Amino acid sequence: MKRIAIDAMGGDNAPKAIVEGVNQVIEAFSDIEIQLYGDQTKINSYLIQSDRVAIIHTDEKIMSDDEPAKAVRRKKKASMVLAAKAVKEGKADAIISAGNTGALLAVGLFVVGRIKGVDRPGLLSTIPTVTGLGFDMLDLGANAENTVKHLHQYAILGSFYAKNVRGIANPRVGLLNNGTEETKGDPLRKATYELLTADNTISFVGNVEARELMSGVADVIVSDGFTGNAVLKSIEGTGISIMGQLKQIINSGGIKTKIGASLLKSSLYEMKKTLDYSSAGGAVLFGLKAPVVKSHGSSDVKAIFSTIKQVRTMLDTNVVGQLVEEFAKETQVND
């Protein structure tokens, strides 16, 4: 049985979307037990009772505008902190939260703990593409500054995730850069390019420009956290703007526009479905001793369901256990 601890009070739509997502998961999968941390009265108002769902009551929660490290230190009984402690103490196998990203990174690092040999765990997310396959990208903001070693480890981590969780036999790894030529980029990117080229354990396809990301040029994209986060927000913003503009044009157009939109309705729906982030799951703080997954702050029921399903796959494949063994081998070699 897979035991998943969930911060029921994190996110814009908590606890409603969280609990309703749990209801769907319990119905869909018989091998999952859920621990919901938060206000019992509020949770119960949406929960379909099940012997595979436990509520751990707490009145305390970390707010979206709380200073992450300070909040984790001071709010010992916060729903997110208690969920992380359950993982550390072996009472749960993974944690999910749609709450404060910085706070989740803090509890991930300081409560759950990082795998020996991993210098800086990276925030990894599977981003949908027009091909329908998507790509894994890290780091998406766990670390504002990175070294060459960090980026090399992100390539290893990303490849490992793509193989074991997404089932890609030989994932192509690309380095996000300002040009495809090997001479492009700042010293960090140039040195990383050389290191990735020399590593025959990964399938490095070279530098990748941001404009190529959505075409599926690689299965794993490596970036420093600052740049990765900026690119992710740009992709999200562009998608929202395009869909909003399409809707405005259709609503304000004449009869010909509306007829055309009606004819294209199924195609537009398929495009939206292909690029829908809510079916891709959450962002994994990868490199920790257990799955720590951040669901989008505005997650709806579908996104919560997808995130729990994603964690189920991570536990099924024992990706973290395999990663611990992999880095233990590397540590022994380096020693």
Curated annotation (Swiss-Prot):
One of its GO terms (biological process) is fatty acid biosynthetic process. Pfam families: FA_synthesis (PF02504). One of its GO terms (cellular component) is cytoplasm. Its EC number is 2.3.1.274. Gene3D superfamilies: Isopropylmalate Dehydrogenase. Keywords: Cytoplasm, Lipid biosynthesis, Lipid metabolism, Phospholipid biosynthesis, Phospholipid metabolism, Transferase. The keyword Lipid metabolism applies. It is an enzyme of class 2 (transferase). It comes from the Bacteria. It catalyses: a fatty acyl-[ACP] + phosphate = an acyl phosphate + holo-[ACP]. One of its GO terms (molecular function) is phosphate:acyl-[acyl carrier protein] acyltransferase activity. Pathway: Lipid metabolism; phospholipid metabolism. It is found in: Cytoplasm. NCBIfam families: plsX. Homodimer. Probably interacts with PlsY. Catalyzes the reversible formation of acyl-phosphate (acyl-PO(4)) from acyl-[acyl-carrier-protein] (acyl-ACP). This enzyme utilizes acyl-ACP as fatty acyl donor, but not acyl-CoA. This is Phosphate acyltransferase. The lineage of its organism: Bacteria, Bacillati, Bacillota, Bacilli, Lactobacillales.
